[in-house]
Amino acid sequence: MTVKTRFAPSPTGYLHVGGARTALYSWLYAKSQGGEFVLRIEDTDLERNSQEAVDAILEGMQWLGLEWNEGPYFQTQRFDRYNEMVDKLLAEDKAYKCYASKELLDEVRAEQEANKEMPRYDAEHPKIKAANEAAKDGDPCVIRFRNPKEGSVVFEDQIRGRIEISNSQMDDLIIRRTDGSPTYNFCVVVDDWDMGITHVIRGEDHINNTPRQINIYEALGAPVPTFAHCAMILGDDGAKLSKRHGAVSVMQYRDMGYLPVALNNYLVRLGWSHGDQEIFSQEEMINLFSLNAISKSASAFNTDKLLWLNNHYIKTSDPKYVAEHLQWHLDQKDIKTENGPAITDVIKLVGERCNTLVELADQIGYFYQDFDAFDADAAKKHLRGVAKQPLEVALAKVEALTEWTTENLHQVIADVCTDLEIGMGKIGMPLRVAVTGGGQSPSVDAVMQLIGKERVVARIKMALAFIAEREANA
């Protein structure tokens, strides 16, 4: 048997973190078993669906690298198939027409609540029975699935173990509305059957749907897939993760400067574990992943942990991979890397200081863009009269260099210290402010080497002009 999993979001909003984790788990399980992963868009809610949401889901999946083997399938393109299966159940007396109006059902529900009974649809209730008997062909009706009245639904959840629900707790589910459109629980079953889905991995909020769906599988004569229901994700305050906890959309994490590999690594550990290991390559995730290692307990989202992972991957990933994802952030700042050093070299130098790609983009502009002003605080502290001579000597030595290497630039700074009998800070900090425009950067000799001789010379001259003007206005 080929294992086949699916991710089946509804296009009513963005791809959120909980959905992304479900997609990741489904993708990993399929890959770990040499199986296939299907993407299905469950768009039967015609009032709330949007193409924008579909695009956001596809963009989020592609950004995470969760490529699908089949799909995306759209439920709205399969209505003929659903109606065929509804008609099959009607013909076999496993479904029936219900003519009870919404007003009548509300009235019956109110009676049940007043009598301290569990509110539910009851086909044998006198008022509902009378409405059905009085109806004529052509009157508006829904189609209800005839749920078994006796026995229980039992299934072995791969995360939670044995689950048993009595059929007496379930009423006759609507499977087709009065407008002719099929409902979620029915479409899901037909889709999973037609698409050969063997394992359904989804959130625990679907547990109540599962016994209903199992009864429909069996009524259709379809194989029942294996189920695994993942616990919810909580915010750091213990409440269910929501917008008030900050970013919950996958693409918001892209915008905030996270690498897909970091978010995937974080999400896989948000409920699944392999000993105490924290860092997992994609290959390790695939090789080690198993459903029975997923926790039954809810997991709390920890942004500090995600930041730590992101910093790890910025430092240790192939700079070409980091550059690929950094480009979007550079575009937002209109930084053109064609006019400067190789971006991979800059990433190697600056990356380990950054927790996000936003920070990285913020810190590398001076490699590619000239500036006409220095950071006010840094200039006030370091571009003073006392820095004039060290900068002048450094400028002369820099201009005289014939081989522009980090080693030679390091020697220039050392020679300035020796010649003027000053400490490293007396030239290092003024030089840093001169060539970067600010007071923080990696080793200034390495920075100068990447910026290039022409720009370094011009910036030191600009710093000297700044000092001269400052002294003149003193």
Swiss-Prot record:
Lineage, opening ranks: Bacteria, Pseudomonadati, Pseudomonadota, Gammaproteobacteria, Vibrionales
Sequence motif 'KMSKS' region, location on chain: 240-244
Record: residues binding ATP: K243
Subunit-structure text: Monomer.
Pfam families per the UniProt record, alphabetical: Anticodon_2, tRNA-synt_1c
Single biological process term from Gene Ontology: glutamyl-tRNA aminoacylation
Alphabetized UniProt keyword annotations: Aminoacyl-tRNA synthetase, ATP-binding, Cytoplasm, Ligase, Nucleotide-binding, Protein biosynthesis
UniProt function note: Catalyzes the attachment of glutamate to tRNA(Glu) in a two-step reaction: glutamate is first activated by ATP to form Glu-AMP and then transferred to the acceptor end of tRNA(Glu).
GO MF annotations in UniProt: ATP binding; glutamate-tRNA ligase activity; tRNA binding; zinc ion binding
Source organism of the structure: Vibrio vulnificus (strain YJ016)
InterPro entries membership: aa-tRNA-synth_I_cd-bd (IPR045462), aa-tRNA-synth_I_codon-bd_sub2 (IPR020751), aa-tRNA-synth_I_CS (IPR001412), aa_tRNA-synth_I_cd-bd_sf (IPR008925), Glu-tRNA-ligase_bac/mito (IPR004527), Glu/Gln-tRNA-synth (IPR000924), Glu/Gln-tRNA-synth_Ib_cat-dom (IPR020058), GluQ/Sye (IPR049940)
Catalytic activity line of the entry: tRNA(Glu) + L-glutamate + ATP = L-glutamyl-tRNA(Glu) + AMP + diphosphate
PROSITE patterns per record: AA_TRNA_LIGASE_I
CDD domains: GluRS_core
Residue runs in coiled coils: none
Known EC number: 6.1.1.17
Cellular component per GO, a single term: cytosol
Motif placement: 'HIGH' region: 9-19
Name of this protein: Glutamate--tRNA ligase
Intracellular or extracellular location(s): Cytoplasm
Family membership noted in the UniProt record: Belongs to the class-I aminoacyl-tRNA synthetase family. Glutamate--tRNA ligase type 1 subfamily.
